[in-house]
Amino acid sequence: MRKIIHVDMDCFFAAVEMRDNPALRDIPIAIGGSRERRGVISTANYPARQFGVRSAMPTAMALKLCPHLTLLPGRFVAYKEASRHVRDIFSRYTSLIEPLSLDEAWLDVTDSPHCYGSATLIAREIRQTIFNELQLTASAGVAPVKFLAKIASDLNKPNGQYVITPADVPGFLKTLPLAKIPGVGKVSAAKLENMGLRTCGDIQQCDLAMLLKRFGKFGRVLWERSQGIDERDVNSERLRKSVGVERTLAEDIHEWSDCEAIIEHLYPELERRLAIVKPDLLIARQGVKLKFNDFQQTTQEHVWPQLNKEDLIITARKTWNERRGERGVRLVGLHVTLLDPQLERQLVLGL
């Protein structure tokens, strides 16, 4: 049985700001774009969260909920440096590390000799070391598989950890809401609930063939996760090939002005996600996705060397005019395809 740890830094960007400026510790702060630029919140500290401020929330809404919110533009150089230090701490315990972003990662410590081979003790020691060396807190989840470790890391935040042993898995899954499974969003959760499926225990009673018919490949993932099956390895060579952000709309839109407003809202989040993956990575292409109310979708992209909002809007307008017809639009997405590192090195080195 494998021993997987998921480590998640607590409100990471905000925590770095509070560490470097103690005057910010007890007041509501958030990292994000300005209200005037239709920005969104990237991270909020716990005092701000008490007012309802959350990640991915429009800045204008956050300021309505918390008028005295201190808004910071973000210092990605500082965040990357802290993230590198955390990664160095991980590497003292295992070489099997799979980063998901600057502030979270999976670790496979199955064969680690540290702490008598106890994943629970390793997680505790890693968290203490992070605090000792960086004055930042982290939460952790320990489980036999990746998705359960990720869920567990969120159950005792902040500055805590939660352990799911192999013996705990059946009981834990029986009452686990399907919405907690990574990849099950609000739309999918609502669709499942309309079918009377709310927990993994409900899925365990379902026929796999029915799930495949209703949900395709996603149906198999649901069934496997509900059984505690997740055979994915912790991949230390994982390479992000693209970065995207999209929104499924509560109501279909039929006017271009509505689509443009959504792009304006999504763009800062795309900037943030790209910066987290690797700010200096070259872009191969950028593009847009529209999904229509008949569930058909179209993607339009072209070669572009750097992220550019105006170009994305022009591309989306062209796609809207040429491919929508009379259909309503139920999803709008933006994405970039990252340049292969091998090719990037060749371009940088030249001849």
UniProtKB/Swiss-Prot annotation:
Similarity comment: family membership: Belongs to the DNA polymerase type-Y family.
Protein name: DNA polymerase IV
GO cellular component: cytosol
Swiss-Prot/TrEMBL GO biological process terms: DNA-templated DNA replication; error-prone translesion synthesis; SOS response
Domain UmuC: 4-185
Chief subcellular location: cytoplasm
Catalytic activity: DNA(n) + a 2'-deoxyribonucleoside 5'-triphosphate = DNA(n+1) + diphosphate
